[in-house]
Amino acid sequence: MDDFIQAAIAEAKLGLQEGGIPIGSVLIKDDKIIARGHNKRVQNSDPVTHAEIDCLRNAGRIGNYRQTTLYSTLMPCYLCAGAVVQFGIKKVIAGESETFPGAREFMESHGVEVVDLNLDECKQLMSEFIDQNPQLWNEDIGN
């Protein structure tokens, strides 16, 4: 497992420690982490502060995103996939998509390379959270 997905997992665990949903993200440029984020919907009472959005906000204005790669512990949803496409991010690496299939086809149809690592650690993190917080998870995915 590479350092970048490990950093995203660390962000997910930080979110869980804060009482939130354990999804983390990092943005990579020139083989360096330039931003980190995690889902803060619960912490900030903000329905759009998903991990990927938090990460992009933390990156600030970097100009061109075409040379970046976004890592997320879970396949990005349509909200986050829209941001990926809007900013021209060319590659997304997801820890898993079993828990939530996300918007892979949408991103790929817009020229984004999508890699699903199918990591047990990411699946377990989500599975344990959902078992303990089904209502919160259903709220997060719009059910």
Over which residues does each language-model region extend?
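Short, basic/aromatic recognition patches
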Residues: 1-18
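Secretory/periplasmic and organellar redox-cofactor proteins
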Residues: 9, 124-143
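Short secondary-structure junction motifs
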Residues: 18-22, 65-67
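Short beta-strand scaffold segments in enzyme catalytic cores
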Residues: 23-31
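Zn2+-dependent cytidine deaminase-like catalytic core
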Residues: 35-128
